[in-house]
């Protein structure tokens, strides 16, 4: 995993829309799709912090490193600012979750089976992180291959559908789990 000051590398993003307190729509995207839109739409490049320039060789700040801040709110604010240049639908905030949160949710809902690289894969609380890393190994840096974190999007879709029909007891457990995740900074909101 690639660590960042305010968490990990944001490989998968989701655009989530709520209307009248209800989930209206969601779309998952690879961070590099957002980076391409940002590069096409930005008018002025942002100089990256020294570590990003020095260690990653970037002459300008890529959107995936916008959160290179020790203060999550400052990094999220920069991300929102950069996001505006993409031409994508407007956003009102940023929610960051680590794979640990996905694991915790799978612990509540039970395993899911999704098709990864053309084969069904059973993903559960114990193997979700390993599956993400397996995808990194399988694709071995191939920039034309789907993101190794695409598995999060596949699992995320199933979890959203399950949670949208969950009973009250499961939703209460989810709230408790999210509270713990927020306390541990595995879930951050801006």
Residue ranges: model-predicted function:
Residues 1-190:
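Non-catalytic, solvent-exposed segments at the cell envelope interface
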């Amino acid at each position: 995993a690639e660590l960042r000051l305010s968490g990990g590398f944001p490989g998968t993003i989701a655009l989530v829309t709520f209307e009248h307190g209800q989930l209206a729509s969601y779309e998952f995207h690879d961070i590099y799709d957002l980076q391409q839109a940002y590069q096409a739409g930005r008018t002025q490049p942002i100089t990256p912090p020294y570590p990003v320039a020095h260690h990653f060789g970037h002459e300008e700040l890529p959107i995936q490193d916008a959160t290179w801040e020790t203060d999550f709110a400052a990094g999220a604010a920069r991300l929102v600012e950069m996001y505006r240049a993409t031409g994508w639908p407007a956003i009102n905030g940023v929610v960051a979750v680590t794979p640990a949160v996905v694991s915790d949710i799978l612990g509540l809902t039970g395993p899911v089976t999704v098709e990864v690289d053309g084969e069904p894969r059973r993903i559960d609380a114990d193997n979700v992180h390993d599956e993400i890393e397996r995808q990194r190994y399988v694709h071995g840096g191939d920039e034309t291959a789907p993101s190794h974190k695409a598995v999060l999007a596949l699992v995320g879709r199933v979890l959203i559908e399950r949670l949208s029909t969950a009973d009250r007891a499961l939703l209460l457990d989810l709230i408790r789990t999210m509270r713990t995740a927020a306390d541990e900074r595995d879930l951050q909101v801006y």
